[in-house]
């Protein structure tokens, strides 16, 4: 037996913790934390360690599957599957154009550079009418839109300088469980405790006393009250002259406009909307301005409310007004460091702003965010007749039946497709409706470089990995599947023909066009890179894996003073004044709740769940795990509900039934339900099917008028609900 210990890194979530894979005769047998990793330093969570069970899961799809006439699946060869998929796709494309084709791309896809880049090339080949839906419209798309408004580029994203701050305010995030989101900080819990150890503070503002709040200071807030709080903080910062107006004028335009908009939102005025005492708000504003190194950070809770783009915009505005943007210990910007980066970002920003302004979804007229449409309207794009009706859907690394609002609507719509193809590890609740399910390689069966997360690291860091093992069974990397489809269609699609010509031209010089070729160029041109031989000993993909298998730190901290290079607008200053923001603030003033739904629903993360896709790992499901709804003890008492009772949670859009967990660690009038559950036996994962649970997104609306206008985001927090005991 040949046993090998291979350094690599985890790609389940954003800290990208270093791992050591134990491989026996080509089979992954265990994973453990990498003690020699410069940043994670021997830490990994339960999910990372349990991933061996995913790789070797007997329920995993390891051969291509084709739907039978009886409704089940049968094995099929790759060539037969791809030939039929390409023929049917080409026929539908010929009859209806690229507007008949849709692609849903799930969250794990962002953790594979090759998946991301190959899909981008596929999208370019089919042109702008191709429908692309992503998990981003349930997660992060309004971060991109807020950045586009403020900095001119959706990719200019500030991150809190956790390693140097003395006051970290966390709103709507739970990093002790999530390990950080749109923020790459290994061992983030330890780094937050370091803040306190050096005499600083960590304040968590959340409707629930989360696992993070339990370890630091907690300030409860009414769900989806964050925009009111942030506006009142701006009111105090400007009103008490806590703003360095000269610095603000150097960094941004539109400050006077913003000050006027915030003027009506005094802490006394917003108290009814936030539940926070006015003196507490004033004290917080003074502390943010008076602490030399302070940062406000928000994530899913601030993104998935009724006005998430506004809230995200206001997070940056508060950091700016308090003097904490682009400052050590504040909120800072990462950069790749390649020559001409600002001009490249300037061109890309102009392109994406133009697409955002000009391209609209067929259903609802939503703008295009990073070339994508809201997943919330995917069902209606399938069922609504007319030019551009989706007739083919490809799904990779996703389970939208469980992750988009009103999954039942989507599940019913899938039956009307002419062709549906899934690329994934399991037959999940969505892929159960496919004509073909194609087996994908896991993260340990492919090379990788965490491309999307390079600018989200307070400690600039590079790590790449080769595949630890060969793909199990007949699994293939997603990019190879996408490339195969493109190769088979190039004669019938002009855009793909141009891609084929580029591929053939490079082949004449012995160069294979692949995602690795592109990402290697990014590494070589960026900070620490070899600049294609101009910098002796610099980094390349191969040199990273061979000489730095545990990764390498490029610098201890991010550089400050880069805002002018990050902003791609002419004049190099942020733009605060936007009609869209004024309209959103007006909408906030006019918020009304439906009668008969007195409580507010929020989401919550679980340490042993990763969205909808890791409920089949025995290690994570041990102890007969059950999904619960968390409810305040006073609310339970008033409704004659006791711990463990079954309750019905109803919204204007649906209802689910769950056992209740009574607690004091939540604001009264609020209930919390973890997402990702609702496995109802239609998928091919037996442990997940046995776990069951309820799909909380059945309580959410997919109606276009209920999606956030600027980013097409689903409203997943602050949802009005009613909770009633279920008669035994």
Model regions: which residues?
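Flexible, glycine/charged-enriched surface loops at secondary-structure junctions
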Residues: 96-100, 243-248, 295, 326-333, ...
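Active-site phosphate/pyrophosphate-binding segments
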Residues: 233, 251-375
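C-terminal, active-site-flanking charged/polar segments
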Residues: 416-419, 423-448, 453-461, 486, ...
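N-terminal export/assembly segments and adjacent metallocofactor-ligating motifs
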Residues: 1-240, 254, 277, 368, ...
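Long, contiguous, secondary-structure-rich segments that constitute the structural scaffold
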Residues: 467-468, 472-532, 536, 612-630, ...
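Short glycine-rich or small-residue beta-strand-to-loop segments that form or flank ligand, phosphate
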Residues: 101-107, 170-172, 295-305, 394-396
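Extended redox/cofactor-interaction regions of prokaryotic respiratory oxidoreductases
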Residues: 116-193, 198-205, 212, 227-231, ...
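Short beta-alpha connecting loops at secondary-structure transitions
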Residues: 214-221, 448-451, 460-471
